[in-house]
């Protein structure tokens, strides 16, 4: 995916990178990334469609954000969470680890729609135990496997690590171009607000969700509570303008 390198190089050469203004972020490093999760508190995060961080269902443990297995299905306990700053052009870098048979997701440009789940509002990067969750065998050409644009574009190469192991993720969102990288390889690229995007969504189960068909220009980063154990750590952000 050569476009990723072209866009990123242009941003760096033109000096478009700025530091994130979040109050809980650590001082920017030389690479422009700042931490948006300090590994000790939930400062800067809150529940989706909620004013505060969930009182149960999520915990900070051993430097991670842990969604606790509930056995009650999607958003059955704490619910989805969001980083409480709207973003437009950025790079997101983090690590995730899934429990056996687990499912979760990472959202960008998410919107808060009352009484609706987060997945109806934004593109989702799939987080999954490919070996033990049935979703891995559904969809088309592996587009429900880890690292994929969920149910739309399969991650290729499919290089997710098994449950219990850490996966390193990088997401670039810049002027409508989105690139997912997993464990050092670019695995998905798509282009928002284009005719190709609109056709892909119109032919999918998301066709009736206007915020997916025509995503917002800015929105929240979200982490999904799908009722399964999942851990996130080393969550860092670089703002691109």
Which positions does each model-derived feature cover?
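Carbohydrate-interacting regions of secretory-pathway proteins
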Residues: 20-241
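Bacterial Sec-dependent N-terminal signal peptides
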Residues: 1-28
């Amino acid at each position: 995916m050569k476009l990723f390198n072209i866009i990123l190089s242009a941003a760096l050469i033109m000096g478009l990178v700025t530091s994130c203004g979040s109050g809980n972020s650590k001082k920017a490093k030389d690479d422009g990334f700042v931490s948006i999760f300090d590994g000790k508190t939930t400062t800067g995060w809150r529940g989706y469609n909620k004013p505060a961080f969930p009182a149960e269902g999520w915990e900070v443990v051993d430097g991670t954000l842990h969604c606790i297995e509930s056995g009650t299905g999607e958003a059955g306990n704490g619910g989805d969470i969001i980083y409480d700053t709207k973003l437009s052009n950025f790079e997101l870098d983090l690590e995730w680890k899934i429990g056996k048979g687990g499912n979760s997701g990472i959202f960008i440009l998410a919107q808060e729609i009352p009484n609706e789940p987060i997945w109806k509002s934004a593109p989702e990067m799939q987080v999954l135990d490919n070996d033990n969750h049935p979703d891995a065998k559904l969809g088309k050409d592996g587009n429900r496997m880890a690292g994929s644009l969920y149910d739309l574009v399969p991650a290729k190469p499919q290089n997710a690590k098994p449950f219990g192991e850490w996966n390193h993720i990088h997401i670039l969102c810049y002027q409508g171009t989105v690139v997912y990288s997993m464990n050092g390889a670019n695995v998905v690229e798509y282009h928002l607000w284009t005719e190709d995007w609109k056709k892909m969504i119109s032919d999918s189960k998301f066709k009736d969700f206007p915020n997916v068909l025509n995503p917002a220009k800015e929105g929240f980063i979200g982490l999904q509570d799908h009722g399964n154990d999942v851990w996130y750590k080393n969550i860092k952000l670089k703002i691109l303008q």
